[in-house]
Amino acid sequence: MTSTQAVSFDTFQLAAATADLSDESAASDYADIVEFRLDLAYADTSLPDPLTAISAYDHSSSLPLIVTNRPEWEGGAYDGETIDRLEMLITAAKHDAVIAVDIELETLKSQHGKKVARDIRNSGAVIIASTHDFTSTPQQSVLHERLHTAAQLGDIGKLAVTAQTHRDALRVLAATEQASQWGDTVATMAMGALGQHTRVVAPLYGSRIGYAPVNPTDATAPGQYDIKTLSEMIDTLTHTKVEDD
């Protein structure tokens, strides 16, 4: 298990994605961080209020948190007002357990989004600027531009697209490697069956965050492995690479 103080996005971090912070204990053997989906928790009436759940979270002995409050227009579950959605993120970032906040790239392009990012950074959390395409993979030049812009507006640029061909997956890996060469800190993956393997190999090309649900039935994006499976595959691949080198 990784302590909050020890986490650095200079190296790869594996995040267990969940709407229920009680999943942390099951994830702690495999994950470095928990991605807490406020939008999914807020939409599920059987779960505690997400901000209350963060307040009750024992950060001293638990994994640190990335908080995400994804709107419906970016594939999430939050259907309320933008100002309320972002205020939840600002409030969440004030808790010691929260080390990173995910905000959509389109939101960060607005003046209000930039102000929200400043407020969150003032609380000590970093910004993950995320962009998603749930239907296709853009051309290489678009991938480079979108990922670089995300890395500039955020502290980490996150790009998730949908692979319709194996070549799409290769383009994502190429964009990841190029971004790393430019000095950008990025997290990348290709969603869908044809992009599933990128979740395992992207760290070799410079991706700094991987995402997986604790339970495969709770996947928050197409093509996700469960946290145990992804952790074991990445560990095997990384150790094999070290031995080959």
UniProtKB/Swiss-Prot annotation:
InterPro entries: Aldolase_TIM (IPR013785), DHquinase_I (IPR001381), Type-I_3-dehydroquinase (IPR050146). The gene is aroD. This is 3-dehydroquinate dehydratase. Homodimer. PANTHER family: 3-DEHYDROQUINATE DEHYDRATASE (PTHR43699:SF1). It comes from the Archaea. 3-dehydroquinate binds at residues 35-37, 70, 199, 220, 224. It comes from Haloquadratum walsbyi (strain DSM 16790 / HBSQ001). GO terms for biological process: 3,4-dihydroxybenzoate biosynthetic process; amino acid biosynthetic process; aromatic amino acid family biosynthetic process; chorismate biosynthetic process.
